[in-house]
Structures are given as structure tokens and as C-alpha cells.
Amino acid sequence: MGSNITSTSIIFLLTGVPGLEAFHTWISIPFCFLSVTALLGNSLILFATITQPSLHEPMYYFLSMLSATDLGLSISTLVTMLSIFWFNVREISFNACLSHMFFIKFFTVMESSVLLAMAFDRFVAVSNPLRYAMILTDSRIAQIGVASVIRGLLMLTPMVALLIRLSYCHSQVLHHSYCYHPDVMKLSCTDTRINSAVGLTAMFSTVGVDLLLILLSYVLIIRTVLSVASPEERKETFSTCVSHIVAFAIYYIPLISLSIVHRFGKQAPAYVHTMIANTYLLISPLMNPVIYSVKTKQIRRAVIKILHSKET
């Protein structure tokens, strides 16, 4: 297109998985199955932590926050993805695109915040167990949750809102199955350096800082565990952190890999970028319920109790 277009009049076209449009129906089958599994798993854990008195403890409150965040992320991606794959509904208005982008970014940042809170929870439990209940009171946990929401809103709203100031004069085709912030900026014919700077600042100030603090927490946890005299005590103490470490790795390793591929894998086919991005948004919501059900005895018992009660 040769002339500038105001953002409010734009209709973007989402391609889904570029180059593999003919296989969208087949691609949708595993994505749909895994997404529904993630929805059911997180719903079950959230229901268990709410209804089972034995799970009314700080660790499980944070786990319920993680499940709620994963539910939001799964719903945000599933609706648009299946609309493209099953019904070929590819057009999305600029405002809808911004809303979609905001919720995906928001729940991604919220997940990072909750993982940081869970790392802090384990640090307090391991390093200062006698004061654990005094430090992580119900009111303080609620404050942490509210602070995480406010931080996400304050950091992400400018990043998304600044897209409104841009003019768009190129093709309005987004080679993705959802509104990906860097791809939307590429369609602009105006200077996007401010947008890029704000976006990088927002993500580093949230996900980047969280990553550093989580790593510091686990370094301190490991140092505390190694200082325990008895090997049995070391094993028991460290086992309480295993599920958190796995969840942390499952969230951050794909995120870092996606960033590396996006920055340095420009020669890779477009469908590779899209499939990696879609998989990244799915893997944490899918795996977190599995990790905590397998590694946490109390969660496993609560889930089994709920399932048995429904059968009877």
C-alpha cells in the first residue's frame, strides 16, 4: 500500500502457520488436544486448592495463582488459534489485535511474577522455616498477587498502547496465529525505535528481573541445602524445590529459545518461528499441572479425592 493508514481503520490478516495453510486442520488436532488438556489440568488444580482445606497454605495459594494465569494464557491463545485453523477466520481488527496481544503479554508476565513468588516461598521455607507462617501470611500473599497484577498493567499498557501512534502503509498480513508485538511493529512505515525501547524495557523490567531474582533465590536455597549436615535432610529439603525448578526451566528455557530464534534465526522459514511461538505459549500451561501433580503428594491426593468424589 502506498499511503498511510490510521490504526483505527486497520484490519490485520493472520496467516496461521505460514506455508502450511493446507495442513491447518491436521496441525490443529494436537494443538487443540494439548490446549484442552492444559485447561482441564489447571482447572482441576485451581478447584482443588480452593476446595480442599489441606491445601490452604502459602505454597498452594501461589500454585493456584499459577494455574489461574495458565488458564488465562491458554484461553487467550486457543480461541484465536482455533478460529484460524478450523473456521478460517483470519481477519482481526486493530483494537482486537491490541487486546489479544495485551492479554498474552500480561499472562506471560504474570506467570513470571508468580514463579518469582514461588521461588521466594521456597527460599523462606528452606532458610527460615520457623518464621515461614509469620512471613507468608494470607494478607501478604494477597498483596503479592495484587502487586503482580499492577506491575503487569503498568509495564505492559504503554508498550501496547504506543502501537496506536504508528501509521501502517505496508501489507497488513501477520505471519502468525496471534498478534505478535514485533511483527505488528514491522508493518509500520513510521519510526518504531520508541516502541522497541519501551518493549525491551518492559520485558526486561519484568521477565528479565524476575529471572535474575529467581536464579539468586535458588543459589541461596542450594547453599542452604548443602549446609545441612545429614544427607537425608538434604535430599528431603531439596525434593520440596524440584517441582518449582522444573516449572521455572519449562517457562524460561523456551522463552529464551524463542528470543534467540527470533533475533538470530531470520533465515529460518516463517513456519518455524510460528510453530516455536505457538509451542512456547502452550508448554507451560500444559506441563505445570503434570509437574505439580506428579511431584507434590498433597496435590496428587487432593486431585484423586476430587475425581473419586465425582465418580461416586
From Swiss-Prot:
Cytoplasmic side: 48-66, 121-143, 223-240, 295-312
GO molecular function term, any single one: G protein-coupled receptor activity
Name of a matching Pfam family: 7tm_4
UniProt entry keywords in alphabetical sequence: Disulfide bond, G-protein coupled receptor, Membrane, Olfaction, Receptor, Sensory transduction, Transducer, Transmembrane, Transmembrane helix
SMART domains given in the database record: 7TM_GPCR_Srsx (SM01381)
Extracellular side, ranges: 1-26, 88-99, 165-201, 262-273
CDD domains xref list: 7tmA_OR51-like
SUPFAM superfamilies listed in its UniProt record: Family A G protein-coupled receptor-like
Subcellular location: Membrane
Listed transmembrane segments: 27-47, 67-87, 100-120, 144-164, 202-222, 241-261, 274-294
PANTHER family per UniProt: OLFACTORY RECEPTOR (PTHR26450:SF408), OLFACTORY RECEPTOR 56B1-RELATED (PTHR26450)
Family: Belongs to the G-protein coupled receptor 1 family.
UniProt name for this protein: Olfactory receptor OR51C1
Organism expressing this protein natively: Homo sapiens (Human)
Lineage start: Eukaryota, Metazoa, Chordata, Craniata, Vertebrata
